[in-house]
Amino acid sequence: MSTEPSRTALAARLRALHVPGDPLVLPNVWDCASARAVADAGFPAVATGSAAVAPALGYEDGEGTPADEMLAAVARIARAVPVPVTADMERGYGMGPAELAERLAATGAVGCNLEDTDHRTGAPADAGEQAEYLAGLRAADPDLVINARTDSFVRGAGGPAERLADAADRMRAYLEAGADCVYPIGALDETAVRAVVEAVDGRPVNVLSWPGGPSPARLAELGVARISFGHQLHQLLQEYFTGLVAAVARGDSPFPKD
């Protein structure tokens, strides 16, 4: 008899970690080694980041990775760690909600991040269509933990006030459609974070931790329920590796001196 937790149990565990004021912190990963490092450090869940996975696989972010390859990467990561895994699936890679739910379940992931940018045009998708997609995904997999990202702050029209209003409308629509958490990427300073948290009346909000932005501890004080890091840890590691390679190219040792 298997002692492994069921997919339903893993999903419930992930969902329960989204607590406003006591956020789930997710250093985003891109392969099995980075996923194991996060799990070994004691983090209770692992999240992939498409902008880190894509270059690790040799592709551009923005759905440049073939769906089969992205899903295969997610499956490898889910097998590598004992904690719940949530996968960044961009806007679904052209799959309908039922197909996405089925293929995600096959990887072992119990959560997903879905954004509302139409990568064919680079413009925000219609909010109603995105909400309908999320509702279909929820119907196809009641267990799946859905983190619904809105790109209003980074791709929306108008000034800061108009973008905040659009983000608020989208977040509320996505929660009503069945999302568990909303992710207004680009809400970086305290004023914006406070505004998006207030806009959804205490429902879980994911915020991107960014250089120069509020610390994870401060984001917790602002009522955030989930903190992610996008591609930034992968980028820092790549910059470090590039420096090591440059040292070797100069004829120097890449190793720290005693």
Positions of predicted regions on the chain:
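Structured C-terminal subdomain patch of bacterial secreted/periplasmic proteins
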Residues: 235-255
